[in-house]
Amino acid sequence: KSQIQALDRTQPGLPMKKGRCGTMTHDYKRNGTTTLFAALEMLQGKVIGQCYQRHRHQEFLRFLRTLDTEFPGKVPLHLIMDNYGTHKHENVRAWLTRHPRFVLHFVPTSSSWLNMVERWFGQLDDKAIRRGVFRSVEDLEASIDAFLITWNKDPKPFVWTATVDSIVEKLARCRRTLEKIQPGCTS
């Protein structure tokens, strides 16, 4: 998840009280950003995540090395990810060639719902970021790290509620729509 903003409100919000919701000012001071690379272990729901100052191939390679350490052995690791350029850099491709147990699967454009870690990002946003006040990137990263630790104490796997057929149909519909907009883009 790139460009997570460390936002500080210009004034304190009013707390919730009987008959009124809590409030926040609409304006804010932006104190920088962080990038979170995260991997969701599907069976148990555990999340491995690391914050980085930037979202380049160098940081992504560091994260891949972390995953290689976290999941030792020769068991294949299937990574589902978006089409961000960082994931396709020549140095990343070279590293993947030397580490063939890493199998990358790229979701189609505008299909982030296919990537289960996006559900976890939603939880992170709802519970640790959205209404937060972060006076620095360090404060933001500390909040993300605390959420990761709390989540991993009692991880819950995300479970698909859609059927395989409905997912395949959504993908087909997505491809048809993309082909209408930009012929040849899905081949």
Residue ranges and their predicted role:
Residues 139-187:
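C-terminal domain-tail junction helix/linker
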Residues 2-4, 42-44, 84-86, 110-112, ...:
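Short, solvent-exposed loop/turn segments at secondary-structure junctions
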Residues 20-28, 96-116, 132-134:
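RNase H-like polynucleotidyl transferase catalytic core
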Residues 47, 117-139, 150-152:
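Active-site proximal helix-loop segment of RNase H-like, two-metal nucleases, encompassing DDE(D)
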Residues 55-56, 79-90, 109-114, 139:
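Acidic, metal-coordinating catalytic cores used for nucleic-acid/nucleotide bond scission
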Residues 74-76:
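Short coil/turn segments at beta-strand junctions that form active-site/ligand-binding loops
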Residues 1-65, 171, 175-181:
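Extended, low-complexity cationic-aromatic segments
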